[in-house]
Amino acid sequence: MSNIEQQVKKIIAEQLGVNEADVKNESSFQDDLGADSLDTVELVMALEEAFGCEIPDEDAEKITTVQLAIDYINAHNG
C-alpha cells in the first residue's frame, strides 16, 4: 500500500467516523461508509488540505469511492 493510499484511507476514516479497517479501496463513501453530501464536502476539503491541492467541484462530484480519491490524489499531487 502506498503512502498516499494510507493517508487517504486515514483521512476518510477520521472524517467519516469509521474504523480504518473498514475503509476498502472499493468502498463507496455514501453506500458503504454512510457519508451524506455534507460529509463528502468535508472529506474533499480535508483531502485538499492534507495534500495541498485544489479539487474543483466538478471533479469532487466524481470522487465517490476510496479508490477514486486515491487515484485523483496520485494524479494531481506534486
From Swiss-Prot:
Keywords: Cytoplasm, Fatty acid biosynthesis, Fatty acid metabolism, Lipid biosynthesis, Lipid metabolism, Phosphopantetheine, Phosphoprotein. Belongs to the acyl carrier protein (ACP) family. Residues 2-77 form the Carrier domain. This is Acyl carrier protein. Gene3D superfamilies: ACP-like. The modification O-(pantetheine 4'-phosphoryl)serine is found at S37. The keyword S-adenosyl-L-methionine does not apply. Pathway: Lipid metabolism; fatty acid biosynthesis. GO terms for cellular component: cytosol; membrane. The gene is acpP. Disulfide bonds: none annotated. It comes from the Bacteria. It is found in: Cytoplasm. GO terms for molecular function: acyl binding; acyl carrier activity. 4'-phosphopantetheine is transferred from CoA to a specific serine of apo-ACP by AcpS. This modification is essential for activity because fatty acids are bound in thioester linkage to the sulfhydryl of the prosthetic group. The keyword Lipid metabolism applies. It comes from Neisseria gonorrhoeae (strain ATCC 700825 / FA 1090). Carrier of the growing fatty acid chain in fatty acid biosynthesis. One of its GO terms (biological process) is lipid A biosynthetic process.
